[in-house]
Amino acid sequence: MGFETLAKDDSELQPTTRFRLIDIAGMLSPTSLVLFAVTVVTLSAWAQRSLTAPTAVAKNGGSAQSFREVVDETGRTVRIPQPAMRIVSLAPSMTETVYALGLQDRLVGDTDYCDYPPEAQKKQKVGGAINPSLEEIAHLRPDVVLVTRHLNTMDTVHSLDALGIPSYATDPRNVDEIVASAKRLGEVLGAPEAGAALAEDLQHRLNVLQQKIGALPPRRVLFVVWTDPLISIGKDTFIADALRRAGAVSIIDSKQDWPQVNLEEVAHLQPEVLVFADSHAEQTAPHLDVLATRPAWRILNAVRDRNFAVISEAVNRPAPRIVTAIEELAEKLHPEAFVGKPAANKVSGNTVGNKKCLCAR
């Protein structure tokens, strides 16, 4: 996966259909497979990642402000003021994590695509994630700019370096690393207690979920990223790991992050459930109706039986809210493990108006 880049410019990120191409930061894009090539190019530009936790070295340097040297998740050494009181986020996942840490008052700017929580939309905008306005960023006088290896580019990082603005990059590859990354970010921003508390809560919820569904056989699913052409997820993506945590297993056994597959191959594997990520389930339902009428798709038993699971788009972002999406999918796939939950959570038993599908809450 990538430094979150799946588009050449922000004009490619405007949604035009409910079955939109999603990047792993959770932004929605209608463009073609050229987006995936950009991811590969971006990856090659980044330094080899390091899982070394940030190491604190307090430095006064003759000034009144204290600094700390940290090693970010791509192996870069960064010098950050402590505590970091003015933060700019260049990725939706980073914005969500800042809010989850309770540090939203320090967030002075974010991108046009930082839409969660809703309050984040009121922050000063610095443009898109791919080509942010360096002038706007500099005007905000940030102590640190938060970026991700999956979305932002090395050009942006180099430009920030030239302006003397430190940037800290994350690069989580699975759910455990997302939790660890949130904790580490709290430390980097000078709020270690908040980071530890957030990570502890997320891990506790994952442990509770494992106790509920760990002994149940996993449901075989197809995670649908894009319908035409049909694109799914690779087995080493953090989304695939999220599915496993929810008691599911992707039928696509590919090392590519975003493999294009054909329906005949899927028909041979016959997934039990098709999983879609969209926070606007009621708008998604009509499109599932159309999908269910297409002869090419009706070779799948899950389509004929309308075994669709629609969950929150949070599953697409390497941020704390992914745990909520995991819990959501687990309840839909394994309702028997959740005492007191309504039968409507079953894969084949939910409705949106007269439209039968599983809806994200």
Predicted regions and their residues:
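Bacterial N-terminal signal peptides
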Residues: 30-44
